[in-house]
């Protein structure tokens, strides 16, 4: 069996679902069709992620796809399985949640379409990050997860949801340049050490030369990467307040008191 093709199919499922739902007119297409496409793609991602995880863990062999651009090893399979499981569970739960909001008039057909389109796109971007063997593509995938999440946060198009989406953008993109600079530092150092500089963008090509990298330069790259990923991952002291926190300033006393 060609497991590399299954890796491509795994990433393609949510992307195709997102593009398909985006192409459908929200006014004339019943909500049930969006729900069917949404759930079918997530079920496919769940099955393939668990199957590939079991294959990699039992065989002990990693799977490459599209040359060296995508790579699934034992560690990556854990994240892929988590994305598949959590994506399916949250996607299944959101069906009833969205239906309820439609019934009480909180969401319009176009907003329902927006939610399902960007939910699938978000799953796709997370899979790209977990499977990418290219350090630049991984950085692009991380930024893409932020952009797709913004439209999910602001799906209701209310004042509070749009404000929360704006806060999320500010918090998560404040360190975009730091993350890119840290990635470029890793590539630049690897290109100097490796005989073939074209291979310096692939994680699997970097690992054998890791002991030859400049320690100080790698520490600087780590700091820049931490500045970028800290707000997204919620790492202290870079973790932000929740994006839906109250927009009005608190009085000094409650703000200074412990939670």
Protein language model regions, located:
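Short hydrophobic/aromatic segments of transmembrane alpha-helices and their interfaces
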Residues: 1-2, 12-13, 58-62, 118-121, ...
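Transmembrane helix-loop-helix hairpins at membrane boundaries of multipass inner-membrane proteins
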Residues: 1-9, 16-117, 197, 204, ...
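Structural signature of hydrophobic alpha-helical transmembrane segments
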Residues: 2-14, 74-85, 135-148, 216-229
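Hydrophobic membrane-targeting signal helices
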Residues: 12, 16, 20, 47, ...
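Helix-loop junctions at the membrane-solvent interface of multi-pass transporters
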Residues: 23-24, 55, 97, 131-132, ...
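Internal transmembrane alpha-helices of multipass membrane proteins
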Residues: 40-43, 65-67, 72-177, 248-253, ...
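Juxtamembrane/interfacial segments at transmembrane-helix boundaries in multi-pass membrane proteins
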Residues: 56-69, 102-108, 178-251, 259
